[in-house]
């Protein structure tokens, strides 16, 4: 596993220099170079990606000849780089980050550095935006975050991208708050210790780090609702309405309206179609063996929100994917959000 400090250094370099240098490195993760062992990059241990990836590992190993090595990472943006280099065969990423990477837009790390080798395998479940705080901070709306100390997620992560998008939507820029960058588990510790006022945490509920925090510390979750939610939805069609059910976390008894993106499995175009088809069938023919987000993961919805071209191996399982792909509109900070929709058939 890459250490947090080393990973942060790598991501800082990526953001500063783009991915051009990284793409010239040939990795060793692709299955055809590794026999039957596949590398699967997940996310932090306090989120949903890591435990779900380990459930996928069990299902795949029980139903194919492959063995799976699951690696904890900084999640979406870092995982895109791993797929591009060939260091990972499969990875979990957000569908909005996949779109930005494939099109070379949206965030600084990808500007002008389109990752055209990125391919989709399947979408999975809503990645719910949690804005977690403590009741004593008095933070009740997104607008109240101005002037606060906020953990926006690991540097370069999809969580950080979403956090800055949402804050910018209500007129809060990085000059208007003190930003901290750490994993979900570290963010929970910071909230518990009073070192930050709020944290953005993006993932399928319930998130382990927040569940654990709520057992020892009073928490509240900030609503993204009303006009604010409409502004966020208008800023990017890759956001969708969502809700955290009351009782998901101790002490949070009422439903919390919010927004979400979509979790997806991605791969590299160079991975063989047979390998991708075998892994995909193993997962989607054995969803009854899953316990995490199992209600959302099905063959019927596996192409919902697919934002990049589908790998031929996945197309053999699901058929062609005709999706609505966004077109970009640049914002004041240089990040691109999406205001238009263009139909794209993602078949290759």
Segments and roles (model prediction):
Residues 1-348:
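Hydrophobic alpha-helical segments
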């Amino acid at each position: 596993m890459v250490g947090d400090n080393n990973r942060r250094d790598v991501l800082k370099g990526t953001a500063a220099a783009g991915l051009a240098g990284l793409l010239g490195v040939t990795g060793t993760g692709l299955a055809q170079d590794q026999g039957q062992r596949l590398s699967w990059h997940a996310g932090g241990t306090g989120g949903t990606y890591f435990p779900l990836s380990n459930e996928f590992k069990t299902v795949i190993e029980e139903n194919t000849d492959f063995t799976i090595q699951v690696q904890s990472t900084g999640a979406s943006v870092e995982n895109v780089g791993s797929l591009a280099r060939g260091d990972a065969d499969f990875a979990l990423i957000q569908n909005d980050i996949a779109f930005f990477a494939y099109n070379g837009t949206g965030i600084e790390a990808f500007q002008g550095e389109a990752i055209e080798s990125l391919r989709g395998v399947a979408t999975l479940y809503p990645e719910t935006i949690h804005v977690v705080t403590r009741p004593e901070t008095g933070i009740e709306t997104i607008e109240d975050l101005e002037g606060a100390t906020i953990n926006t997620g690991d540097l370069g992560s999809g969580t950080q991208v979403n956090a800055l998008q949402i804050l910018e939507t209500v007129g809060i820029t990085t000059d208007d708050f003190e930003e901290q960058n750490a994993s979900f588990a570290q963010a929970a510790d910071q909230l518990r210790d009073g070192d930050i006022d709020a944290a953005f945490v993006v993932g399928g509920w319930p998130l382990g780090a927040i569940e654990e925090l709520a057992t020892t510390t009073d928490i509240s979750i900030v609503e993204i609702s009303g006009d604010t939610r409409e502004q966020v939805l208008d800023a990017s069609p890759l956001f969708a309405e969502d809700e955290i059910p009351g009782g998901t976390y101790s002490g949070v008894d009422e439903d919390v309206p919010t927004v979400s993106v979509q979790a997806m499995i991605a791969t590299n175009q160079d991975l063989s179609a047979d390998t991708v088809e075998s892994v995909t069938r193993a997962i989607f023919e054995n969803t009854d063996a899953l316990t995490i987000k199992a209600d959302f993961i099905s063959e019927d919805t596996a192409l919902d929100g697919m934002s990049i071209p589908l790998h031929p191996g996945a197309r053999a399982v699901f058929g062609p994917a005709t999706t609505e792909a966004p077109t970009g509109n640049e914002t004041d900070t240089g990040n691109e959000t999406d205001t238009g929709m263009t139909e794209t058939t993602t078949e290759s």
